[in-house]
Amino acid sequence: MAQNNEQQQQGQGLIEAGVLDDIINRLLEFRNARTVRQVQLSEAEIRSLCSASREIFLQQPNLLDLKPPIKICGDIHGQYGDLLRLFEYGGFPPEANYLFLGDYVDRGKQSLETICLLLAYKIKYPENFFLLRGNHECASINRIYGFYDECKRRFNVKLWKCFTECFNCLPVAALIDEKILCMHGGLSPVLTNLDQIRNLPRPTDVPDSGLLCDLLWSDPSREVKGWGMNDRGVSYTFGPDKVAEFLMQHDMDLVCRAHQVVEDGYEFFAERQLVTIFSAPNYCGEFDNAGAMMSVDESLMCSFQILKPTDRKPRFL
């Protein structure tokens, strides 16, 4: 307990416990409403969430060492109502431990509520709630795909810059019980030793190439043996052989990543040696995909909880 209190102090030195609880309560106010409304937080409150969480991210390693049981979630992309449904399903923190694999902002309507709730939980439960960086937690990307516009419309550009400083400190990978390696995108041709991840500098922007870029951008591909060109125009694709080779070299069981919409919310690759998890159902209102969350128990058994896409009213354009 002492360690937990100490950790909480570190983040909450910048934000009082009562204030933090009030922010969380306001963010959860509409959790049972049919439609999720905008939550009114002040600019000062949001800034304090950014700076307090930033401190915690930097105190914790870039490659997190986590213990099960834990629930792993993929892309959320501003679909705040669906984030609340995930918590309804899996248990609101601290009922369960969580690891999110990045891409909290952009595309969806409520990136601000989404990222604010996640940062607030990080500050309140620093040892039970974990957030990794996705390729959208990067200024050059979320400047274009919606988050910048949402910050500017609801607050100002200075607040968007405050989030950028926070995102530049997010950890980039997690290792569960030394057996399950988690990141947003995938493997990298330059990754031979996990210390390379531990030693990546922070704060940092996401470069156009190299290890950090690959961890956030690469994709598995059934069409490729070895490394291939990525249609995204960034990073690489990697074949099943590269997954098997990596796991064997590092005595691991599974690579767990997000970054791609998959129809059932989760999808295995390379004979179940890699899994993609995507947690935004009806992504952008354009896909008919389910969302999923992977539960890892103490014995590293993985099971999936599914958010069906059809819990929605039909959309008429």
Curated annotation (Swiss-Prot):
Short name of one Pfam family: Metallophos
Name of the molecule in the record: Serine/threonine-protein phosphatase PP1 isozyme 1
Family: Belongs to the PPP phosphatase family. PP-1 subfamily.
Comment on bound cofactor: Binds 2 manganese ions per subunit.
Keywords: Hydrolase, Manganese, Metal-binding, Protein phosphatase
GO cellular component: cytoplasm; nucleus
Binding site for Mn(2+) 2: D103, N135, H184, H259
Gene that this polypeptide is encoded by: NPP1
Active-site residues from the entry: H136
